[in-house]
Amino acid sequence: MGVQKTVVEAPSTVSAEKMYQGFLLDMDTVFPKVLPQLIKSVEILEGDGGVGTVKLVHLGEATEYTTMKQKVDVIDKAGLAYTYTTIGGDILVDVLESVVNEFVVVPTDGGCIVKNTTIYNTKGDAVLPEDKIKEATEKSALAFKAVEAYLLANLQFLA
């Protein structure tokens, strides 16, 4: 299995706790509300939403894919960390075995920084083309900005 990795840091004026809650813990409801063109709905297949939960994400019309199956690996509320692995669905194409997304939300004066490490585990000696990695990174950045705008407009609803 080959491994390709990206690391992205995104600053925000949203507090670390509210970003962690809205962007990561509540992603199953926030993303379809804010970005229905990317994520239509999320269905829990196994588990209760905690570590070990397996979800089926139904993708929207803005993507060429229809589904991705994710498994929640880490929920560390004290450390503001969240990790999930995409383990199935047509989004993995023929090249990928899995994709691990590790998030850590770091508090800053006046907001936070969301650090996202994405690890692409390819099948055999396969290599994911750089343009596909760049495209995925750009879509993630746009999704982050859309969710951030939603959170800024709706902070009163976050615990």
From Swiss-Prot:
Keywords noted in UniProt: Allergen, Pathogenesis-related protein, Plant defense
Molecular function GO labels: abscisic acid binding; protein phosphatase inhibitor activity; signaling receptor activity
Domain of life: Eukaryota
Residues spanning the signal sequence: none
Cellular compartments per GO CC: cytoplasm; nucleus
GO BP term, pick one: abscisic acid-activated signaling pathway
Keyword presence, Isomerase: no
Coiled-coil segments on the chain, per record: none
Entry-linked CDD domains: Bet_v1-like
Classification via Pfam families: Bet_v_1 (PF00407)
Record-linked PANTHER family: OS08G0374000 PROTEIN-RELATED (PTHR31213), STRESS-INDUCED PROTEIN SAM22 (PTHR31213:SF55)
Family: Belongs to the BetVI family.
Protein name: Major allergen Api g 1, isoallergen 2
The organism of origin for this protein: Apium graveolens
